[in-house]
Amino acid sequence: MRRHVFLVGLLIGGSAVASAQRPAPQHVDVPTIAPRPEDVATIDGILRAFYDVISGPAGQPRQWSRDRTLYIPDVHFVSLSTDSTGRVRADVVTHQMFVDRSNPSLVRRGFFETEIHRTTARFGNVVHVFSTYEMRERAGGPVFGRGINSIELFWDGTRWWIAAAQWDDERPDNPIPTEYLP
């Protein structure tokens, strides 16, 4: 038992050291701009922009200022994954944290996320969307992954806002159900 506790202590300590040695993401400046009316006037418009702003070829800067206009100021994103033991991990980040962490790889490698199916539930001014996506490194290139974005939106009387977004990628143990496929 004591050996087990010691090994766990080493693993935890080692993880802390590894984390401390990992460089912090470089801050990406995201100037504030006005939203494009066509991006926020309809559910279709805001979801089209949701995918458009993050997609682009290698070397092309992403449209982070435009992206920020889609969300409430304190939006949080939740990325779900499963570790090697099968335990679910939820990584909760702000918009700025998401931009800082994802920008280098998106710009270096290229990334295209495309909606392939949508299920929408609406009550009054509240909407929930399950948006199934495919991911590619090049426009029209091979699909390297799929998943579902779960997006909460609301209408404030003048425009649509995304209040929260969470997603999970398809895996062998987590196939996309047929009702969320085209």
List PLM regions with ranges.
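Short, low-complexity N-terminal intrinsically disordered segments enriched in polar/charged residues
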Residues: 21-69, 180-182
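Bacterial N-terminal signal peptides
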Residues: 5-15
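Short beta-strand edge/turn micro-motifs at domain boundaries
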Residues: 21-26, 146-175
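N-terminal secretory signal peptides that target proteins for export/translocation
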Residues: 1-2
